[in-house]
């Protein structure tokens, strides 16, 4: 199996966290998001422990809420020693509603409105990741009006290409996020920030991309950031206390994908950082990482009921399910790969080549193409694996479809964490 929390029981059904997925679909319906809390906690602990053991005191991971965000997630993150990266007032509100400490929230965004800034300040968010000069000015003004000095990190782009998808490559020079180092603009950004009396500049942030499987791109980013930090020390006497290296470690969507050694990569990154600081006689800063996908992706899967089976002679066969791009738009957006398995018939031979399609009125509403399954029948249950990240959070009500429920499994039990939407929910905001 793709991950160790998945298995097949005596009935030939897929299990997750020891629970039968067929039984879960019968109890909670389908489509259904399933999140294995035990795997989630294991992933959190991997990051927390690796950073504590290898990085300076005060280093810890921040969960990237864009990957998955619902109220019941945040108590688990807090219990496991995680901070959280939030990108909107809605994510801030959700985290706080889940009892998450405001001081452990780091507020991102390349276009924070005045209302966003005010809400975050009034919510006592711990740190702002500042993206641009205009935000600096507005944040300084708003903090001053409240009589506070706000902690900030400055987002800079190191010009690193980690060879990932264009849509998730965020560290290159030509990017809407952050201020580029290479052009000299980041140096002016730092000078502007240091002159703001209501802001406390703690260090720098960079995020080079996603689905990165080795430490080397992060080490390259560290080299550039340390050179930049040294230049800022020489120019302004400013020493960065914190380097936030963003997220980006990858996950396995297919059996052919490499296994990512998170502790090994963090250990290699720490060694590289300490060596670079020693060469420059620069105090070793604490390090923050922002894992999202690698915390929740392999803790999640999605269950679907098969509806129609259609073979277009001389072309291909389609298996349609009762969900699609409304609950997982990533194949339509990126041709993102996923492993699809016959959850109710795991022991059957998989000799039927087919494309799994969704129910939306779009020819691009596909989940995966040209995969091997058993000869499918109506009401069979399919599972799409590794959907814990960027499925629930990217879901929509296109075609006025209700969003699925989300169930958390833990210690052999399942509990409803997010209820399924109703038709009444669809018109709740209509006037």
What positions do the PLM features span?
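A charged N-terminal "starter" segment
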Residues: 1-151, 187, 191, 195-200, ...
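Hydrophobic residues within beta-strands of alpha/beta enzymes
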Residues: 84-85, 105, 128, 204, ...
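Active-site-proximal loop/turn and secondary-structure-junction residues that shape catalytic pockets
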Residues: 67-69, 90-91, 111-113, 132-134, ...
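Active-site loop/helix belt of alpha/beta enzymes
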Residues: 3, 159-308, 373, 401, ...
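Charged (often Lys/Glu-rich) extended helix/loop segments that serve as interaction or gating elements
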Residues: 268, 274-277, 282-431
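Short beta-strand segments
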Residues: 64, 151-157, 205-207, 244-246, ...
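Short acidic, glycine/serine/threonine-rich loops at helix termini
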Residues: 73-74, 97, 117-122, 139-142, ...
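The start of beta-strands in P-loop NTPase/AAA+ ATPase cores
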Residues: 83, 126, 150, 202, ...
């Amino acid at each position: 199996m793709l991950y160790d929390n998945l298995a097949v029981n005596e009935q030939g059904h897929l299990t997750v966290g020891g629970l039968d997925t067929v039984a879960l679909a019968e109890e909670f319906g389908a489509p259904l998001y399933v999140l294995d809390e035990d795997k989630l906690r294991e992933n959190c602990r991997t990051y927390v422990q690796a950073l504590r053991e290898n990085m300076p005191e005060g280093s810890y991971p921040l969960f990237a809420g864009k990957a998955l965000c619902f109220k019941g997630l945040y108590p688990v993150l807090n219990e496991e020693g995680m901070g959280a990266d939030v990108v909107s007032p809605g994510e801030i509100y959700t985290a706080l509603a889940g009892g998450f400490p405001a001081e452990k929230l780091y507020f991102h965004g390349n276009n924070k409105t005045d209302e966003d800034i005010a809400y975050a300040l009034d919510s006592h968010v711990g740190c702002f990741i500042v993206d641009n000069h205009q935000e600096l000015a507005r944040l300084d003004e708003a903090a001053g009006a409240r009589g506070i000095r706000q902690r900030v990190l400055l987002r800079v782009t190191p010009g690193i290409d980690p060879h990932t998808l264009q849509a998730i490559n965020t560290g290159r020079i030509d990017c809407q996020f952050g201020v580029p180092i290479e052009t000299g603009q980041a140096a002016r950004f730092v000078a502007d920030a240091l002159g703001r009396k209501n802001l406390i500049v703690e260090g720098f942030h960079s995020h080079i991309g996603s689905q990165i499987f080795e430490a080397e791109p992060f080490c390259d980013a560290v080299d550039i950031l340390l050179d930049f930090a040294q230049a800022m020390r020489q120019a302004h006497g400013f020493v960065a206390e914190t380097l936030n290296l963003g997220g980006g470690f990858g996950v396995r969507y297919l059996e052919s994908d490499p296994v990512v050694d998170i502790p090994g990569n963090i250990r290699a990154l720490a060694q590289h950082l300490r060596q670079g600081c020693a060469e420059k006689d620069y105090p070793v800063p604490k390090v923050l990482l922002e894992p999202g996908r690698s915390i929740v992706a392999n803790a999640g899967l999605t269950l679907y009921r098969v509806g129609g089976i259609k073979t277009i002679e001389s072309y291909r066969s389609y298996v349609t399910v009762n969900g699609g791009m409304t609950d997982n738009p990533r194949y339509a957006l990126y041709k993102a790969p996923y492993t699809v398995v016959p959850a109710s018939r795991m022991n059957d031979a998989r000799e039927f080549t087919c494309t799994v399609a969704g129910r939306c009125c779009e020819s691009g509403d596909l989940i995966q193409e040209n995969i091997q399954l058993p000869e499918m029948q109506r009401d069979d249950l399919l599972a799409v694996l590794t959907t814990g990240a960027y499925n629930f959070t990217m879901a929509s009500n296109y075609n006025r479809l209700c969003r699925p429920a989300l169930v958390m499994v833990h210690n052999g039990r399942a509990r409803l964490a997010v209820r399924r939407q109703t038709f009444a929910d669809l018109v709740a905001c209509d006037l």
